[in-house]
Structures are given as structure tokens and as C-alpha cells.
Amino acid sequence: ARPKSDCEKHRESTEKTGTIMKLIPKCKENSDYEELQCYEDSKFCVCYDKKGHAASPISTKVKECGCYLKQKERKDSGRESAIIPQCEEDGKWAKKQLWEFNKSCWCVDEKGEQVGKIHHDCDSLKCE
């Protein structure tokens, strides 16, 4: 048998604890952490990256993780000029994205892909 992954070890140790509200990690077949992790008997969820680090706030509103994971990846890159995605509380991409570094903005679709052109008058940009 192959050695247990960090996710599987984390899952086993959590299952043994007697905490009232606990998050028992869900692991993918490839041993990475599932992106959306939810607490037992509760509506609270959180996004994890594949190594098991939180990528979003713990919230009853978090439903998807694509934006939060991209946001964490960019923040962790340490690049000052990195474009940090803006996410809605539920984890969806905010329709209007802003790049502070050069004060530009644009609209995105539900996958975070740019729609239309880049603008510099961000107050007047309306994204539907």
C-alpha cells in the first residue's frame, strides 16, 4: 500500500477528535485536498488549496472556490504587480476586476475570463 497523504492523515486525526463542530477533510483520489471543505453538521464551508491551506474565509456563503484559489495563488506568488482577483463572498468571480498596480479594470465572466476591453475610468465601468 502507498503511504498516506497529508490529506488522508489530517482526515484520520480529525475523525478521532471529539470536537463539536469539526471539519473532516475530504481528499481527492490523487490525495490532494478537495477544494470546498464543509464543517460537519453545519452550513459553514471554506476553500482549501491542494495542500490543505485555507484560501477563503470560513463562511455559510462560500459555495465555490475557483476565484478564491486563484486569489491565494496570486497573493502567495509575492509579486507586487500580481493581479489579485476580486471574489464575491460565495466564491464566484466579482463581475468587475481591478488591477491596483496600474489602476485598470475590466469585466469577467463566471470563469474569471475577461469580457470586453480594459478600462482606466473604473468608477464608470458597469459589468453585467
From Swiss-Prot:
Tissue specificity here reads: Expressed by the venom gland.
A single BP term in Gene Ontology: cell-matrix adhesion
Q: Which cysteines are joined by disulfide bonds?
A: C7-C27, C38-C45, C47-C67, C107-C127
Gene Ontology cellular-component terms for this entry are: basement membrane; extracellular space
**Compartments, as annotated in UniProt:** Secreted
Q: Which Pfam families match?
A: Thyroglobulin_1 (PF00086)
Keywords linked to the UniProt accession = Disulfide bond, Protease inhibitor, Repeat, Secreted, Thiol protease inhibitor
All residue ranges annotated as the Thyroglobulin type-1 domain in the record: 4-67, 72-127
Q: Does the keyword Nucleotide-binding apply?
A: no
Q: Which GO terms describe its molecular function?
A: cysteine-type endopeptidase inhibitor activity
InterPro entries associated with the record: Dev_reg/Prot_inhib, Thyroglobulin_1, Thyroglobulin_1_sf
**What functional role does this protein have?**
Cysteine proteinase inhibitor.
Give the protein name, as stated in the record: U24-ctenitoxin-Pn1a
Organism this protein belongs to = Phoneutria nigriventer (Brazilian armed spider)
